[in-house]
Amino acid sequence: MNPAQDLLETRYHVRLLRGAEFTRDSRLSDMALKSTIYKAELQIADMDRHYYADHALTIACHPSETDERMMVRIAAFALFASDRLEFSKGLSDTDEPSLWCKDYTGAVQTWIEVGQPDERRIAKASGRAEEVIVIAYGGRTSDIWWQGVRSKVERLRNVTVWSLGEGVAASLGALAERTMRLQCTVQDRTAWIGNTTSEPVAVEWTVFKAPENV
């Protein structure tokens, strides 16, 4: 074999090795970022909406997601529960919301965001879904966030924005366990969420923006 052929074969093997290393590193990365699975049996008695049902929930919690955020997602499910509402991939897929409800054709009816999304993400969701609900939390930081996005978000007619009360997310986070049995009662625009061993958390919110009639 001449020197030119030796060089070509060497480069070929280097590419193979690099490809193998890339595949191995990708698998290790996927393993490192693997979500933790939580299970929750949720009993809902919503007297405001006349909705009464039990739900068996499976929640994938991304390594970067806090207990507080995960439990706010569960609270959001309880507040807007329906037969078709479901958790998305969450932080594992930035193109999906925290929760959503689709019709039988796959069209998005309800898009629920938890946290403090920027105005571009909210606008994009507004164009994809019939209604968008943002549930912010964090007390004072939510107020600052809202002032930053308000001027643009208020133009979006199908968007609702709520802000949970100070300390609510932290109190919900304290309920987090890998396997949970939760009860949620909703009456007069207040929800109480608890388990069998602790006092229920009063979940109250301020309406930053209500949807307009379309």
At which residue positions do the language-model features occur?
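Short, Lys/Arg-enriched N-terminal segments with co-localized hydrophobic residues
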Residues: 16-30
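Glycine-rich, aromatic-bearing surface loops/beta-hairpins
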Residues: 180-214
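Long amphipathic N-terminal alpha/beta scaffold segment
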Residues: 85-104
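Acidic-basic catalytic patches of nuclease active cores, encompassing PD-(D/E)XK
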Residues: 46-91
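Short, hydrophobic/π-rich interface segment
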Residues: 147-184
